Amino acid sequence: GNERFRCPETLFQPSFIGMESAGIHETTYNSIMKCDIDIRKDLYANNVMSGGTTMYPGIADRMQKEITALAPSTMKIKIIAPPERKYSVWIGGSILASLSTFQQMWITKQEYDEAGPSIVHRKCF
């Protein structure tokens, strides 16, 4: 039925489900615009879609169309949607967790049990 359309469309139009928030294309655009003007060209040309929510057919083409409509007309927009993107978030987290520089941010169960959620802010920010 039309759920196949409505479900992924919610990513671009959250108002479909009563949410007053920006779609993924607007959030991407707003994030790029908050960055230094000297790197925006690179950011527009290197958008990588990741996670299971991006597995909808045609989502990369739709993202390309929507970002192109928002960006300056001379800007090259490139949306990368690797076939393994369903697991790329987990893979990225796995790589990050294995870096020796990240170990100082590890939180043990004992630390969390003793300090609660505030330990995350103390160790990670």
UniProtKB/Swiss-Prot annotation:
Record Gene3D superfamilies: 3.30.420.40, Actin, Chain A, domain 4 (3.90.640.10)
Any one GO molecular function term: ATP binding
Cross-referenced SMART domains: ACTIN (SM00268)
Complex formation: Polymerization of globular actin (G-actin) leads to a structural filament (F-actin) in the form of a two-stranded helix. Each actin can bind to 4 others.
Family: Belongs to the actin family.
Function: Actins are highly conserved proteins that are involved in various types of cell motility and are ubiquitously expressed in all eukaryotic cells.
Name the record gives this protein: Actin, alpha skeletal muscle
